[in-house]
């Protein structure tokens, strides 16, 4: 039976793929668990005790905010068309005692290990922070450069009311818990699930209000908040290997369905190996805004650029600006199966053939 809608916030806790056998893998013991990825960055900012960070122009305001709240200066570096970093630009903008933040966009390596090692051995006292939100659960085969800290948002991967992680040798921040944010999100998730079962629009509207209120709480909180124990228990009970396998299966089906448009140049894959991440199928298309509007009209909610360009980064990088204007993140998460992917892809193909205009 066709669903009322597709996409949006991960809310269906029944799709979280709990462990079914005795082989439960525990969350790594060196992970510090926080309410959100933003809280993990806030904790890092306090532990690092620096004053300036250099991050890619292709990022979102939620990555900038924790450092601004901590009184840091935030600067941005350019990216190349393949989403690797412009190492010349980075070298020219880095200052002594800076923090260099980098991330693997859907599994794409931003720097060579040799470049990072050269910065570490330069005597400039640079700290390295890797954001692994896009590939936190994917197996990594490189065992080279080890950053000073790794952070990630876990809420993008499963229906988790709370979820952020930090791994670092800089110490442990003594964060307190505050369940208001997670409890609001949990209530919103439950109402969203009921809405999809009953079609009661009042439940949907109330869920939206609670998500919005929770987001406001997260943004105004300047201090790091630790993950509450009940949500840590939920996180530790999830089989992320199964979740990643489900996402990759859906990715393969989407690529198979979209292959003719990819061959014709109507759809451009942002990476040739999206399975290295599994977060979304990231594509670049013309008329992205009109295509997305028509998807929404059909109740198919695929995010646009998942990093709306921060105002502070405007004009820094033409690649970042292009991606922000043309990217569509096609959902592939574990709530759905291959039949759902067929429905989503068929609608996307139909819309693209009309240039994003309603059929």
Task: For the regions a language model picked out, list residue spans one by one.
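PLP-dependent aminotransferase class I/II
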Residues: 10, 21-22, 28, 32, ...
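PLP-dependent aminotransferase-like
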Residues: 10-31, 42-125, 129, 136-137
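Conserved donor sugar-nucleotide recognition element shared by glycan-biosynthetic enzymes
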Residues: 33, 37
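Short, solvent-exposed loop/turn segments at secondary-structure junctions
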Residues: 38-40, 59-61, 82, 105-108, ...
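Short hydrophobic/aromatic-enriched beta-strand-loop microsegments
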Residues: 73-78, 150-152, 302-306
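Conserved active-site segment immediately N-terminal to the catalytic lysine
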Residues: 129-167
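Active-site-proximal region of nucleotide-activated glycan assembly enzymes
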Residues: 154-155, 161-186
